[in-house]
Regions:
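Extended beta-strand/beta-hairpin segments
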Residues: 1-35, 42-134
Length: 134
């Protein structure tokens, strides 16, 4: 069974669920995906800030495949995928954003490191630049 959660950064730098939903209504498997997406998002934000890159949009979809037909207590994840959709201001910022995502995914996000011990984790990213004239 496929489970997924999507979060996005808000104006104040916090994260919110993409679909209007309360955290209390998420099942434990979705909560695991949510916490990992949150960890990755906060890590990407911190690295981008150190690189002096302002992210105009940051959306993260975290998904996983369960080994059962429905969500059960005994259900185990067989694989995970994290997809980043990011907007930055200038095209020359794209390499820095890509590097921030790579570092967060491969090195600094503890949530993803823990999931790698459970099942394989793949990732993808889409980075779009929006040239804004003054």
């Amino acid at each position: 069974m496929h489970q997924s959660i999507t979060i996005h950064a808000t104006e104040n730098g916090k994260f919110a669920l993409a679909k209007p939903c309360e955290l209390e209504k998420l099942n434990p498997k979705e909560l695991l995906l949510y916490s990992t997406a949150l960890c990755a998002g906060m890590t990407v934000q911190a690295i981008a800030e150190k690189e002096r890159v302002k992210l105009l949009k940051l959306e993260i979809k975290m998904s996983g495949e369960l080994d059962t037909e429905k969500v059960e207590g005994k259900s185990k994840f067989e694989s995970f995928n994290i997809a980043y959709n990011i907007e930055c201001k200038h095209i020359d910022e794209q390499p820095k954003v890509s590097h921030a995502v790579q570092l967060a995914t491969d090195k600094y996000c503890g949530g993803l490191a823990m999931l790698r011990k459970i099942a394989p984790v793949s990732h993808s990213m889409s980075i779009v630049s929006v040239e804004v004239e003054a």
